[in-house]
A protein has these predicted regions:
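Helix-to-loop junction immediately C-terminal to a conserved catalytic motif
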Residues: 49
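Conserved ABC ATPase "signature" region
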Residues: 93-107
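Conserved ABC ATPase signature
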Residues: 111-115, 119
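Walker B catalytic motif
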Residues: 111, 140-141
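Q-loop/switch helix immediately C-terminal to the Walker
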Residues: 80-94
Length: 186
């Protein structure tokens, strides 16, 4: 069980982004954070990943939990091909399979600067899906994808997650519905 218990957080002297937030995510659960921009969805994900520390409250994650994540920025290594970017955290066969599941079989040897924005998003997603994980964290991972590509990606995410845990932030509640995720408004 992953827990946020009465968490309060703010950046620097800025107003509090999160105020007394409590969440429980059971092992194998699927949770979607949604709400207006700037209300703390990404911050909750960063707290779960240990990238930020709360001002007050506690974040509890079982020891040894392996995370894999896709952030709003794709962060591909520009000197590596699509396949090499995905294979950083997996074997070549798993990387190929994940890229194929996301419709990128023809782009294995492409360099990031030759890929469209949507293709870069899918390479970043393939990298996260190929990495061994207990919890998959997606921060607006499907933003900017067309409807057909988004549907293909949702199917790949659903299959890859299986009975493991998914925590995602999105403005598109249909993504949560497609993945059977409980919706939590922030």
């Amino acid at each position: 069980m992953i827990r946020l218990d009465h968490v309060t957080f703010g950046y620097g002297l800025q107003k509090k982004v999160l105020r007394d937030v409590s969440l429980e995510i059971p092992e194998g659960g699927r949770l979607c954070l949604t709400g207006p921009s700037g209300e703390g969805k990404t911050t909750v994900l960063r707290l779960l990943l240990g990238l930020e520390k709360p001002r007050r409250g506690t974040v509890s994650v079982p020891e040894g939990t392996a995370f894999s994540a896709v952030f709003q920025e794709d962060r591909l290594l520009p000197w590596k091909t699509a396949l090499e970017n995905v294979a950083l955290f997996s074997d070549g066969e798993t990387a190929r399979r994940c890229l194929a599941a996301l419709g990128l079989s023809d782009s294995l040897d492409a360099m990031p600067d030759t890929l469209s924005g949507g293709m870069k998003r899918r390479v970043a997603l393939a990298r996260a899906l190929a990495h061994p994980f207990d919890v998959l964290v997606l921060d607006e991972a499907l933003t900017g994808l067309d409807g057909g590509t988004k549907t293909q990606c949702l199917a790949a995410i659903d299959q890859a997650v299986g009975h493991r845990t998914l925590v995602m932030a999105t403005h598109d509640e249909s993504e949560a519905a497609a993945l059977g995720a409980e919706i939590h408004y922030i």
